[in-house]
């Protein structure tokens, strides 16, 4: 620049010279000068051009050097080269940036996207920026992710914008490099800061460089200017040290534990469009709030500084007495330590304006990070002064003046400036006060640039740090009285007013100080004490400002009493500075806590003193006088605490010389000492624990190991070890206890098992003896009834004893008689005849006699037999018919070992299929064979064809809670009554009960028969019969039982019984046959004690009617009934017979039992349980002699014998020794009878089936002939359509040609009529299969004849097609479509008329057994003639299967060689046009699969497009595995389904898996035949072409839904295992027609359970198969599955 300037001056001078010389010289001289000037001008111009070239080249070189310096860091760190020379393009994909930050901090970026797409690069840049934030960069220091985008292809973007964006990236790299330099864990290459000088500015670069290498002096604090985000301790110090790093400065390295170069204000200036000045790019160092200042105190303790005078900031010779603004101050060129500068100061200014005060925003964001600065030594802190400053202005960041204002550091009293001045007010004092206050002014001026909120925030932060109770040690209030210090009255101090003393300065009284209090208090003020002291101070200021009572310590020599009012000691002891709040932690300063008057303390602290203090109020005349309390000279006995305590009691008089104890005795003082010692120990332990906790867990804990002694650590370790040992021992004890309990339980179990085994052996012995002793000749049941009636007519009232309670004695003589047994049986007989109206094949006379049998058995056999021969006739009763198979089956279950018992589900699901009795049963062969029944009652060889309504469903027996509680309470009441009467009775376990929830059929009027029952009995009749009934009831035994009757709620039906009111109570007058009352075992003459827990008094008919009406509304009636006579045993029973109203001509037969209350028929009516041995006990003599403990023992043994309490049949009574009178089954005779009955059943079913077949065949022939007649009119149209179905022509009969053509036409019209097609699909599958007789002609002859007919028909049709095609080309397609629509409607109506859907529930199970057809064949329409071709042999195998492969090769060849005609080509063209406009739906969505359900499939004829297909599958071949017959995958010799019952084979066994029973084929060598076909045909994958010319089963296009959901005798088939679904819990998907056992509801790929709670409801269905979500996704994505 100087050269250029010289050239310009020289040129100007030359032109001036030329002007002058032009006037003064000659022409020659002028020419010379002109040439010289021109040459000089040329030289200047060339110099200017050369300068521009050199400058631009230098700029290029400088920019290249900068870029190389910026890129060298990336290259050195990542060890990778830039892909291009362009800096931006190399960083655009973000890979280098991610590699760079991963090198600086390994693992911060887990995954880098190395794709070449722009999105991948943007993703990497975003990840890089997030990692920078994790390292510690602020958001303002990061560039935008779009700054690296390529802007060269944008016309509107200028080069300056591109440079600005690159500059932002470089700024981020710069701060990242600085972070790397300050990271102690990073030992790689560092950033070249000189390369960024042009970018950042030389001033900031120089300042940052200086801050990186801080000079150090000998007094080093031991800490370095390092950045370490993960480590809390400090590392190696830097190499240099400067004056501002001294320990007395707030900016020192000791006080600020870390220096951070990060800030909210960063190098973002260039992005906003202005150049980034160093002010906005600079950040000053913040103190770390989490670091402790232990090192600061440690260093200050080692190197104490001499105390500077407190008034060093007052005006003197070198300082002006008034404030002078900084610009007007005198410049001082000499720089000494007092005038040092710090670049890190936010308010530092220089003449060149390098730094400014724009850093104010940092205060608001980071001021909370400033730590609490604590003064620690007597030395005052040094105040930094600015350059050229005559008067000191403290800096709030680095200066310690603020700390000195708040700290308890007290200057030496000897250095007080006004110690020897006269104590009077002078103008100098006023001037001093003004000057002193002006020294505070600059401290507040520093805040002028801040907002009010930031100022309050800063002050709040300082005050919180100082007054925070968390960083201070807690004071124990019980550690005794605190030191009472003198109150300093500063009102006389010059420069102070009373208002200045808001917080009184507390100074220790050296004479009265208590070192123990200072030790235990650790110099912290108790908040309670501080509050109380403030009240105490304000209270005392009102009286007088002079301390009144002073306790003096004894001195040798003469006693000196100072004049308190005249003496200047208090004034001389004024501290120079105000102590706002005393800070803790000074090791050499002890400022005791002020302790006020005891009565000013809060009550919770006063309560902890041992001595009660009373406030002594001095008299008014003595209030102005001062007291001087002189202690004793006997210092050995003197106690400062005692003197302090006694000082409140002492008067104004001088105490005697000798020391006398005050109100506290010696015991109190000893107790005080003990309390002090305990408090001191507790306080020490608490401190130790808090320090350890802060050391281990806290961020604020001390980092010095000197705070925790090795002894404390060892004690803590020992405590932890002891705690661990305690826990370990407790665990061992618990484990040992558990083992002992387990061993005891095993012992008890073994003893119970042995007892049970003995009891079983005893029972078997008893049964054998009972069978051997039965020698009485057998009688028929009818003869026994007649004998019993004759005996009843001749016999008088028997003398029977009755066991009754005390309340019944008063009512004995008042009970009128009820009906006799014969009358009751007659009434029940009449009701039975009225109720039985349904026709049956059983003769009606049996039903009329059965009512007598039913009632008389229950009354007659219950009476005690008069002869011992009758008592010992169990063998003859083996021929009796049983209604109580429920009890007998449970007795079988109870007497068996547990391994032989059937579960509840087996007993319930055994109802599904009948089983013959010729096969052996698993279990004990000596026991009778278990049997069940399906549609008829099968007991003892008799058949009852009762067709139950489908809503009579057996539910799982479960007692209602209120019923079970009621039964238990009743039984307990009866036991208590028995013990009071000293009559020992043995209550049997609760009788079996079950609840059947179903709707009952209404068979009776909606009237209450209880009121009409009152009119049935005449007065004379009551008078005649009542004495007899009264006597009989009085001498009878009775039993109390509870009967629960359920029926459909809301129906106005009575429960089927009538009552009669009597003086003793309410009695049952009659029971209607077939009513719920009969099924609930209610009998005539039963006394009704209560209904629904409501008792009724005599003739309380209104309440009775209300209760009955309420019971009818709810459908639930609970009656407490008392039954008299031998039939009633002294036991409390519970009957829950939830009965339906059944209409039958013949009810189930009865088996005679000795105790009717035990022959309860609960759920056997519905669930048809297994028959078994009738095993009961009626020996009352032995029961009466048993004790309560024996009862409990029997109950316990019965519980373990039955296994669990949740079985269908609860506990049963244990037989006793005296049981020869029991009725026992004759097992062999019963087995023979059951076999005969089974054969009879088979014969009846066969006859019924034959009749049904004949009807179906006739109907089928009529429908076929009608359909052929209707379709003959439209033969021409059908032949044209048949030309497109050439492959199906060889597989059809000639008689069916027109029928199939109609279906083909229908499929075309369904494209236009989608709604009608859906209706046809729903209607077609409802047709049932019709079977052919075995006497038809052989199948092979039919096949040969059919093939010949097809060949002839084919030739004729081809000729007709050629003729028809020429004629049809002239017609419009619209007319044809209209005619076809009419044909379709008429045909569908005719077909539907001749169709009769056969209900699957009406077809017996043996239909499948006698015929060899698959059950799926029944789903076909009867309108097809395919089933005519079936012929089965005796074994059920299809003979047609042997002829499958007999098709000649010529026939198959002829199918391939068929050439489509012109009409077919035209049809294909039309379909192609329609396909273009119609989107194809080749998906397998569930909506399209709904048409594949079992009841919504049309008959799938091969080769013909189904209505449901429409245009979806036009291109798919017609003969692939879509239409593959399911039997191709089956064994040839086994055609019947595994679920079809074939009685020629051994019966399948009932297998229980997970408490669910299903059928399993007995021949283990033969797999289930249809299972494989179902699973393979549903995958939708073409495996093999069908070799058969015909299809005789549902096509595979239905996805196997018909096979899996076919009904076998009304039972569904599991879609997974192909077994009968049964009556257990199942998973059914109605929309798709899928049914599964719970254990079969699993994924077909991985076979994981889909019904469990772990997998939830994640079920996917594809091709009618279940998948879990994972397998389905793999299946969709094409990845291999477990299959």
UniProtKB/Swiss-Prot annotation:
Polar residues composition-biased segments: 819-828, 859-875, 1282-1293, 1430-1451, 1481-1494, 1516-1542, 1573-1590
Compositionally biased region (Low complexity): 961-973, 986-1012, 1591-1601
Region annotation Disordered: where it falls in the sequence: 312-343, 749-901, 947-1037, 1255-1604
Top-level taxon of the source organism: Eukaryota
Domain PDZ: from-to ranges: 1042-1128
Modified residues (Phosphotyrosine): 185
Protein name in UniProt: LIM domain only protein 7
């Amino acid at each position: 620049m100087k050269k250029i300037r010289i050239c310009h001056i020289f040129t100007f001078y030359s032109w001036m010279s030329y002007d002058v010389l032009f006037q003064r010289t000659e022409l020659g001289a002028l020419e010379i000068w002109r040439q010289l000037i021109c040459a000089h001008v040329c030289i200047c111009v060339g110099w200017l051009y050369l300068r521009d070239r050199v400058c631009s080249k230098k700029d290029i070189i400088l920019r290249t050097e900068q870029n190389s310096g910026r890129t060298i860091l990336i290259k050195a760190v990542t060890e990778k080269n830039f892909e291009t020379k362009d800096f931006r393009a190399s960083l655009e994909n973000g890979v280098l940036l991610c590699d760079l930050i991963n090198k600086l901090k390994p693992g911060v970026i887990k995954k880098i996207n190395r794709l070449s797409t722009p999105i991948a690069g943007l993703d990497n840049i975003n990840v890089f920026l997030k990692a920078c934030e994790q390292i510690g960069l602020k958001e303002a220091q990061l560039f935008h992710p779009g700054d690296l985008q390529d802007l060269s292809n944008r016309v509107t973007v200028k080069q300056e914008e591109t440079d600005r964006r690159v500059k932002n990236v470089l700024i981020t790299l710069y701060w990242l490099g600085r972070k790397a330099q300050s990271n102690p864990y990073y030992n790689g290459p560092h950033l070249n800061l000189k390369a960024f000088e042009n970018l950042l500015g030389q001033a900031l670069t120089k300042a940052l460089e200086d801050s990186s290498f801080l000079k150090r002096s000998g007094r080093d604090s031991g800490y370095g200017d390092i950045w370490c985000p993960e480590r809390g301790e400090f590392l190696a110090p830097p190499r240099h040290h400067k004056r501002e790093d001294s320990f007395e400065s707030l900016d020192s390295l000791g006080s600020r534990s870390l220096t951070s170069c990060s800030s909210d204000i960063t190098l973002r200036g260039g992005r906003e469009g202005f150049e980034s000045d160093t002010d906005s790019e600079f950040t000053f160092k913040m103190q770390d709030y989490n670091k402790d200042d232990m090192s600061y105190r440690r260093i200050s303790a080692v190197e104490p500084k001499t105390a500077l005078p407190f008034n060093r900031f007052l005006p003197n010779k070198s300082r002006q007495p008034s404030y002078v603004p900084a610009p007007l101050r005198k410049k001082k060129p000499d720089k000494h330590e007092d005038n040092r500068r710090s670049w890190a100061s936010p308010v530092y200014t220089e003449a060149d304006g390098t730094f400014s005060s724009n850093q104010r925003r940092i205060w608001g964001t980071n001021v909370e990070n400033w730590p609490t600065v604590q003064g620690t030594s007597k030395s005052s802190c040094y105040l930094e002064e600015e350059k050229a400053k005559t008067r000191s202005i403290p800096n709030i960041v680095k200066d310690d003046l603020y700390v000195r204002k708040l700290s308890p550091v007290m200057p030496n009293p000897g250095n007080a400036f006004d110690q020897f001045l006269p104590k009077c007010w002078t103008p100098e004092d006023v001037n001093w006060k003004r000057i002193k206050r002006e020294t505070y002014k600059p401290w507040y001026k520093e805040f002028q640039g801040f907002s009010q909120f930031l100022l309050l925030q800063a002050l709040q932060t300082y005050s919180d740090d100082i007054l925070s109770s968390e960083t201070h040690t807690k004071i124990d209030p019980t550690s005794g009285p605190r030191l009472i210090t003198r109150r300093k009255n500063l009102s006389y101090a010059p420069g102070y007013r009373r208002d200045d003393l808001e917080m009184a300065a507390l100074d220790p009284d050296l004479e009265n100080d208590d070192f123990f209090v200072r030790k235990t208090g650790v110099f912290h003020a108790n908040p309670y004490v501080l509050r109380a002291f403030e009240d105490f101070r304000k209270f005392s200021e009102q009286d007088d400002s002079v301390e009144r009572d002073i306790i003096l310590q004894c001195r040798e020599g003469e006693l000196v009493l100072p004049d308190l009012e005249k003496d200047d000691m208090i004034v001389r002891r004024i501290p120079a500075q105000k102590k706002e709040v005393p800070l803790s932690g000074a090791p050499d300063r002890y400022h005791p806590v002020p302790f006020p008057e005891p009565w000013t303390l809060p009550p919770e602290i006063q309560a902890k003193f041992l001595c009660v203090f009373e406030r002594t109020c001095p008299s008014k005349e003595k209030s102005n006088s001062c007291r001087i309390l002189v202690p004793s000279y006997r210092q050995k006995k003197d106690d400062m605490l005692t003197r302090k305590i006694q000082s409140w009691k002492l008067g104004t008089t001088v105490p005697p010389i000798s020391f006398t104890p005050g109100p506290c005795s010696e015991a109190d003082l000893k107790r005080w000492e003990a309390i002090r010692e305990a408090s001191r120990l507790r306080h020490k332990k608490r401190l130790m624990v808090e320090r350890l906790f802060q050391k281990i867990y806290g961020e604020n804990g001390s980092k010095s190991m000197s705070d925790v002694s090795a002894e404390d650590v060892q004690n803590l370790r020992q405590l932890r070890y002891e705690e661990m040992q305690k826990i370990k021992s407790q665990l061992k004890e618990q484990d040992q206890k558990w083992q002992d309990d387990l061993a005891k339980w095993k012992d008890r179990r073994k003893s119970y098992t042995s007892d049970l085994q003995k009891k079983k052996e005893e029972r078997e012995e008893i049964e054998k003896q009972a069978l051997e002793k039965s020698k009485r000749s057998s009688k028929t049941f009818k003869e026994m009834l007649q004998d019993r009636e004759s005996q009843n007519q001749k016999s008088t009232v028997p003398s029977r004893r009755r066991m009754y309670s005390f309340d019944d004695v008063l009512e004995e003589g008042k009970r009128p008689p009820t009906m006799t047994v014969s009358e009751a049986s007659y009434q029940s007989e009449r009701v039975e005849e009225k109720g039985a109206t349904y026709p049956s094949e059983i003769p009606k006379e049996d039903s009329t006699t059965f009512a007598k049998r039913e009632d008389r058995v229950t009354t007659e056999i219950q009476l005690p037999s008069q002869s011992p021969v009758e008592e010992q006739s169990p063998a003859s009763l083996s021929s009796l018919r049983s209604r109580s198979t429920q009890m007998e089956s449970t007795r079988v279950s109870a007497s068996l070992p547990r391994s032989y018992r059937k579960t509840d589900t087996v007993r319930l699901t055994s109802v599904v299929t009948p089983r013959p009795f010729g096969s052996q049963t698993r279990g004990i062969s000596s026991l009778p064979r278990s049997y069940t029944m399906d549609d008829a009652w099968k007991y003892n060889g008799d058949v009852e064809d009762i067709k139950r309504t489908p809503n009579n469903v057996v539910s799982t027996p479960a007692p209602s809670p209120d019923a079970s509680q009621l039964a238990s309470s009743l039984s307990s009441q009866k036991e208590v009554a028995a013990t009071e009467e000293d009559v020992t009775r043995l209550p049997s376990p609760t009788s079996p009960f079950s609840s059947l929830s179903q709707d009952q059929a209404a068979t009776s009027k909606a009237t209450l028969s209880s009121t009409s029952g009152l009119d049935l009995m005449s007065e004379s009749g009551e008078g005649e019969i009542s004495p007899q009934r009264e006597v009989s009831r009085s001498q009878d035994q009775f039993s109390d039982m509870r009967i629960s009757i359920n029926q459909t709620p809301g129906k106005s039906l009575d429960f089927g019984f009538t009552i009669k009111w009597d003086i003793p109570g309410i009695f049952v007058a009659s029971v209607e046959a077939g009513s719920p009352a009969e099924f609930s075992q209610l009998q005539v003459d039963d006394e009704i004690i209560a209904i629904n827990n409501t008792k009724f008094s005599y003739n309380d008919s209104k309440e009775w009617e209300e209760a009955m009406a309420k019971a009818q509304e709810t459908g639930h009636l609970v009656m407490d009934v008392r039954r008299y006579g031998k039939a009633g045993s002294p036991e409390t029973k519970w009957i829950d017979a939830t009965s339906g109203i059944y209409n039958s001509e013949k009810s189930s037969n009865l088996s005679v039992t000795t105790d009717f209350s035990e022959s309860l028929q609960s759920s056997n009516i519905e669930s048809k349980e297994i028959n078994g041995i009738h095993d009961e006990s009626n020996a009352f003599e032995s029961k009466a002699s048993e004790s309560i403990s024996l009862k409990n023992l029997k109950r316990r043994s019965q519980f373990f014998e039955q296994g669990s309490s949740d079985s269908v049949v609860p506990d049963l009574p244990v037989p006793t020794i005296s049981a020869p009178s029991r009725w026992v089954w004759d097992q062999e005779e019963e087995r023979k009878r059951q076999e005969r009955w089974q054969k009879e059943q088979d014969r009846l079913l066969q006859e019924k089936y034959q009749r049904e077949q004949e009807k179906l065949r006739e109907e089928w022939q009529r429908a076929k002939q009608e359909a052929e007649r209707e379709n003959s009119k439209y033969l021409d149209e059908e032949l044209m359509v048949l030309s497109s179905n050439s492959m199906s022509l060889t597989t059809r009969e000639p008689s069916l040609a027109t029928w199939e053509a109609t279906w083909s036409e229908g499929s075309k019209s369904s494209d236009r009529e989608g709604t009608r097609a859906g209706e046809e699909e729903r209607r077609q599958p409802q047709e049932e299969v019709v079977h052919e007789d075995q006497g038809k002609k052989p199948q092979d002859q039919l096949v040969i004849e059919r093939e010949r007919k097809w060949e002839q028909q084919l030739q004729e049709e081809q000729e007709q097609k050629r003729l028809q095609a020429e004629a049809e080309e002239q017609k419009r397609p619209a007319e044809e479509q209209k005619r076809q629509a009419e044909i379709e409607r008429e045909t569908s109506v005719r077909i539907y008329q001749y169709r009769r859907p056969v209900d699957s529930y009406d077809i017996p199970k043996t239909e499948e057994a006698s015929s060899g057809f698959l059950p799926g064949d029944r789903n076909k329409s009867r309108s097809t003639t395919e089933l005519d071709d079936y012929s089965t042999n005796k074994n059920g195998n299809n003979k047609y299967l042997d002829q499958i492969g007999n098709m000649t090769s010529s026939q198959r060849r002829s199918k391939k060689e068929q050439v489509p005609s012109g009409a077919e080509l035209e049809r294909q063209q039309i379909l192609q046009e329609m396909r273009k406009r119609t989107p194809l739906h080749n998906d397998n969505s569930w909506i399209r699969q709904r048409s594949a359900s079992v009841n919504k499939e049309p008959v799938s004829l091969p080769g013909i497009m189904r209505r449901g297909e429409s245009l979806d599958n036009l291109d798919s071949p017609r003969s692939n595995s879509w239409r593959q017959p399911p039997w191709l995958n089956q064994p040839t010799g086994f055609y019947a389904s595994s679920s079809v019952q074939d009685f020629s084979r051994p019966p399948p066994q009932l297998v229980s898996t997970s408490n669910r029973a299903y059928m399993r084929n007995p021949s283990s060598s033969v797999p289930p035949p249809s299972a494989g076909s179902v699973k393979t045909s549903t995958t939708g994958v073409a495996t093999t072409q069908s070799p058969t010319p015909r299809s005789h089963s549902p096509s595979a296009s239905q996805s196997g839904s018909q096979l899996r959901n076919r009904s076998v005798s009304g039972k569904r088939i599991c879609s997974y295992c192909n077994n009968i679904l049964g009556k257990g819990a199942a998973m059914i998907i109605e929309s798709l027609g899928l049914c599964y056992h719970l254990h079969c509801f699993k994924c077909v790929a991985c076979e994981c359970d889909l019904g469990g709670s772990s997998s939830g409801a994640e079920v996917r269905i594809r091709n009618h198969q279940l998948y879990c979500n994972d397998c389905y996704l793999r299946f969709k994505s094409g990845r291999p599955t477990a299959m």
